[in-house]
Amino acid sequence: MADDPFVLGGTTYASRLIMGTGGAPSLDVLERALVASGTELTTVAMRRVNASVHGSVLSVLERLGIRVLPNTAGCFTAGEAVLTARLAREALGTDLVKLEVIADERTLLPDPVELLDAAETLVDDGFTVLPYTNDDPVLARKLEDAGCAAIMPLGSPIGSGLGIRNPHNFQLIVEHARVPVILDAGAGTASDVALAMELGCAGVMLASAVTRAQEPVLMAAAMRAGVEAGRLARRAGRIPRRHFAEASSPAEGLAVLDPERPAF
């Protein structure tokens, strides 16, 4: 929407949905899902992609005019993540990086110590850093203070489809952030992304929820609609929650009936 721009790292996007590419059953399905999602920014794991291979994910993104967001998936230390980001910048000519530093393979949760270390190094090196982080308001503030261009907290573990398990923390992060907050990981269906937007997130990043759905292209369209609906609801302002009913029709003007007089 022209009156509601999504600005990330100095670039304005029409879509607030950032897509991932992992888990798609084929390049054809991935391409159709990307089109259905309306995304303009899509992540690619640089440790798993050969930028020189034609017919790859990168060639699909180039053909569709979608900007590549390299990520450091698969890195377990700050050093690995920094090296991967620098290789991505050299290969793709972009300073934009989705920073991931994972604590272990079982949970795929971020390592907060290594993440903050890598973020500080990459910001100093001129990168536009978008960190995948825990839903921790304190860590979110430290990442913002380090110079990150956005905060990307998880709603629940990667690929779990559990949605946002701690909406209160998301609200705290959104209320104090001066940069965009983007849901990253945990979405399972369109209602999850709508909730994220209603809580005040500026955007949503997802992959598995679409690529591993029974109908990826259909789910991509659903996610697009969910993001748009949630954003509109946030801007509109929901009614307050109440313990008791409140009639929507006014009491003024109701007929006063005499119980002793017949109606007809």
UniProtKB/Swiss-Prot annotation:
<feature type="binding site">
    <location>
        <position position="159"/>
    </location>
    <ligand>
        <name>1-deoxy-D-xylulose 5-phosphate</name>
    </ligand>
</feature>
<dbReference type="InterPro" id="IPR033983">
    <property type="entry name" value="Thiazole_synthase_ThiG"/>
</dbReference>
<keyword id="KW-0808">Transferase</keyword>
<comment type="subunit">
    <text>Homotetramer. Forms heterodimers with either ThiH or ThiS.</text>
</comment>
<dbReference type="InterPro" id="IPR008867">
    <property type="entry name" value="ThiG"/>
</dbReference>
<dbReference type="GO" id="GO:0005737">
    <property type="term" value="C:cytoplasm"/>
</dbReference>
<comment type="function">
    <text>Catalyzes the rearrangement of 1-deoxy-D-xylulose 5-phosphate (DXP) to produce the thiazole phosphate moiety of thiamine. Sulfur is provided by the thiocarboxylate moiety of the carrier protein ThiS. In vitro, sulfur can be provided by H(2)S.</text>
</comment>
<keyword id="KW-0963">Cytoplasm</keyword>
<keyword id="KW-0704">Schiff base</keyword>
<dbReference type="GO" id="GO:0009229">
    <property type="term" value="P:thiamine diphosphate biosynthetic process"/>
</dbReference>
<comment type="similarity">
    <text>Belongs to the ThiG family.</text>
</comment>
<dbReference type="GO" id="GO:1990107">
    <property type="term" value="F:thiazole synthase activity"/>
</dbReference>
<dbReference type="GO" id="GO:1902508">
    <property type="term" value="C:2-iminoacetate synthase complex"/>
</dbReference>
<dbReference type="InterPro" id="IPR013785">
    <property type="entry name" value="Aldolase_TIM"/>
</dbReference>
<comment type="pathway">
    <text>Cofactor biosynthesis; thiamine diphosphate biosynthesis.</text>
</comment>
<feature type="binding site">
    <location>
        <begin position="207"/>
        <end position="208"/>
    </location>
    <ligand>
        <name>1-deoxy-D-xylulose 5-phosphate</name>
    </ligand>
</feature>
<protein>
    <recommendedName>
        <fullName>Thiazole synthase</fullName>
        <ecNumber>2.8.1.10</ecNumber>
    </recommendedName>
</protein>
<dbReference type="GO" id="GO:0009228">
    <property type="term" value="P:thiamine biosynthetic process"/>
</dbReference>
<feature type="binding site">
    <location>
        <begin position="185"/>
        <end position="186"/>
    </location>
    <ligand>
        <name>1-deoxy-D-xylulose 5-phosphate</name>
    </ligand>
</feature>
<keyword id="KW-0784">Thiamine biosynthesis</keyword>
<feature type="active site" description="Schiff-base intermediate with DXP">
    <location>
        <position position="98"/>
    </location>
</feature>
<dbReference type="Pfam" id="PF05690">
    <property type="entry name" value="ThiG"/>
</dbReference>
